[in-house]
Amino acid sequence: MGRVSSIISFSLTLLILFNGYTAQQWPNECQLDQLNALEPSQIIKSEGGRIEVWDHHAPQLRCSGFAFERFVIEPQGLFLPTFLNAGKLTFVVHGRGLMGRVIPGCAETFMESPVFGEGQGQGQSQGFRDMHQKVEHLRCGDTIATPSGVAQWFYNNGNEPLILVAAADLASNQNQLDRNLRPFLIAGNNPQGQEWLQGRKQQKQNNIFNGFAPEILAQAFKINVETAQQLQNQQDNRGNIVKVNGPFGVIRPPLRRGEGGQQPHEIANGLEETLCTMRCTENLDDPSDADVYKPSLGYISTLNSYNLPILRLLRLSALRGSIRKNAMVLPQWNVNANAALYVTNGKAHIQMVNDNGERVFDQEISSGQLLVVPQGFSVMKHAIGEQFEWIEFKTNENAQVNTLAGRTSVMRGLPLEVITNGYQISPEEAKRVKFSTIETTLTHSSPMSYGRPRA
């Protein structure tokens, strides 16, 4: 009995110490009293392009749980197969290309045949037909959902750089490790190492085959030891993105021109309803599919688990916005998600307010910059260039927003008596506050016509 009491006492002591430690650490975890537009902190150069990495240990990224990267793949550049320890959403900012992914346990569904035999590789043995998992065509505006542990590759088959941005959710249950972004390389290497991993000595990052003995690889693949050593890329300094010499012969569906002048799209292979070939890509750059559209102002499109069911697994969603000069997104906050806002084109003036009613961001933000929008923080966007375009990644598969002004806003839902007494204004002023803005999301902005604040 005494032994049991001692164990219980010891356990309670540990629990108290742990809670005390957590209480000391947690207050500093999300003290977001000053936010900044973020730039990449590390550039990883390769033969066929570069990877730009944001420091996810920065307070606002650490609090939101996001890790953020930008990939620039030059023409004929191949981003070699890699998987992550977290689910991610990738957005095509510029260019076009091909993308393939390998879902664990799924069979090859793309096979060479008279229908899908375009661009077959050179030097293949007579009668040999390749087969592999799904390959997709990519274009600007495509948003790609990738679960953790799924190997993925990209190829630029265009004449301009293929630019992608990716947000990984390190705080989700897809990540069973620490809050470090860990790319696992199937092929290639990273001569510069992973500077963003705290506490790890800087050294070259090799692919996962490098850690196995060549003899073991030879037995596993039933190949000779020399070929096994080639898999390890030990003498290869091209990096994660390599240049492809000559034709890139992979099996993929042909493109057909969309109706009414729309962007080309793939011919379906008839298997999209199965788990192994479930749809993971949605294009957000078509205004005709937008959730909010006004020709004079712009459009906003959302992507969630209702229109892309794989997002239920990732617990992520996205929002694409494009607004014209002097258009404004009415002040709003994310109800159930953090967001990472990346500017793809143009400039805007953004103000953000925290739970203390303090303005924590009041700056211009421009193309290539990243801004974290924490849950509950109210934010206003005002385009100051000819056009402002952005993509937001959110940490909920069905992220919701609420607005401060407009037809569906919190103010519209309050009784006039609450507004008059809460702000000490007349009933007439309360009516103007509640009913003057008839838009729901986008409005024109001409602040000088409304006068200046009292000193």
Swiss-Prot record:
Keyword Nucleotide-binding attached: no
A Pfam family that the UniProt record links to this protein: Cupin_1
Signal peptide per UniProt: 1-24
Phosphoserine found at: 301, 367, 436
Keyword Phosphoprotein among record annotations: yes
Keywords on record: Disulfide bond, Phosphoprotein, Seed storage protein, Signal, Storage protein, Ubl conjugation, Vacuole
PTM entry text: Ubiquitinated.
Chief place where the protein resides: other
Distribution of this protein across tissues and organs: Accumulates in seeds 8 days after anthesis.
GO cellular component, as recorded: protein storage vacuole
UniProt GO MF annotations: nutrient reservoir activity
Modified residues (Phosphotyrosine): 299
Sequence similarity: Belongs to the 11S seed storage protein (globulins) family.
Protein name, UniProt field: 12S seed storage protein CRB
Taxonomic source organism: Arabidopsis thaliana (Mouse-ear cress)
Native organism taxonomy: Eukaryota, Viridiplantae, Streptophyta, Embryophyta, Tracheophyta
